[in-house]
């Protein structure tokens, strides 16, 4: 997700708004039809698809213009995306070949005649088209290393057209809903300004944490801790150094490692083996849960 994800290291607010504005302008210039969402699920039978969990990432099969393609669920990505060879194979119409995605990168924009996920079909869905080989679990790997090549990613541009998303790791399924099905349980997954968040508690502290899944690293949760929460956390240990890959390259950060933190999502609880409290300012810390792999089932 290093090219398409929204987070401070990737896109600032001005760039993100510029992308949205540019996309709308492209629609008008190209006179593109609006996306139509068709839900063929029957009452009591929601649109559920099988899911594979590989190295902490969620994969499903989606239909692109009638072709089934293994797809990465990338809720950190601004747009649903496919690689150039798949776009050529499907005959995707390219209507913009230089959309700025970050200060140093450009992508093509195309339109899919149809995108099917379970019983839901989206007609005339806009997608990004990226160069072949750009999306891979390890960009340094060679072609014969057996590394997973990612040809398609399901992003926020598609998910925001739906009303609910349920990830059930225990049964290996993802359910997509347009609002046709009656909702059960308490929703704790939401989009705010196209950024995905989860509601949860950490050691009893209510938190709305940014939930990111993507191709560059295992899914993770991140959110803010303030000084007033210090009494609810274990004593901070020594400062350690960490690094992560961003669009600009490797970025280092300082953090305190905490163990034994209880995370509660809905009625489910799990003890997290490690929470990294990253120093931001004198009175604020960012809590990150590295490698969170959806072990709490039924995240809605």
Describe each region flagged by the PLM.
Residues 1-300:
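Pepsin/retropepsin-fold aspartyl endopeptidases
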């Amino acid at each position: 997700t290093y090219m398409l994800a929204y987070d401070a290291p990737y896109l600032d607010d001005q760039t993100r708004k510029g992308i949205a504005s540019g996309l709308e302008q492209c629609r008008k210039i190209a006179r593109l039809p609006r996306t139509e969402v068709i839900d063929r699920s029957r009452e009591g039978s929601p649109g559920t698809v099988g899911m594979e969990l590989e190295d902490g990432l969620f994969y499903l099969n989606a239909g692109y213009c009638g072709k089934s393609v293994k797809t990465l669920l990338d809720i950190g990505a601004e747009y649903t995306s496919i690689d150039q060879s798949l776009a050529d194979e499907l005959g995707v119409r390219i209507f913009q070949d230089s959309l700025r995605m970050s200060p140093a990168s450009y992508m093509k924009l195309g339109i899919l005649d149809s995108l099917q996920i379970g019983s839901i079909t989206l007609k005339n869905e806009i997608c990004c088209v990226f160069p072949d080989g750009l999306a891979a679990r390890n960009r340094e790997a060679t072609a014969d290393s057996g590394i997973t090549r990612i040809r398609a990613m399901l992003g926020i541009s598609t998910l925001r057209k739906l009303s609910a998303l349920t990830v059930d790791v225990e049964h290996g399924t993802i359910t997509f809903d347009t609002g046709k099905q009656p909702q059960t349980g308490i929703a704790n997954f939401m989009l705010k300004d196209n950024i995905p968040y989860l509601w949860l508690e950490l050691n009893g502290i209510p938190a709305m944490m940014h939930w990111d899944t993507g191709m560059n690293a295992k899914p993770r949760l991140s959110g803010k801790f303030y000084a007033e929460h210090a009494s609810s956390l274990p004593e901070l240990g020594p400062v350690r150094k960490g690094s992560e890959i961003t669009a600009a390259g490797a970025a280092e950060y300082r953090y305190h490692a905490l163990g034994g933190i209880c995370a509660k999502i809905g009625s489910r609880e799990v003890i997290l083996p490690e929470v990294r409290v990253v120093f931001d300012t004198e009175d604020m810390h960012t809590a990150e849960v590295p490698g969170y792999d959806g072990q709490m089932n039924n995240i809605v």
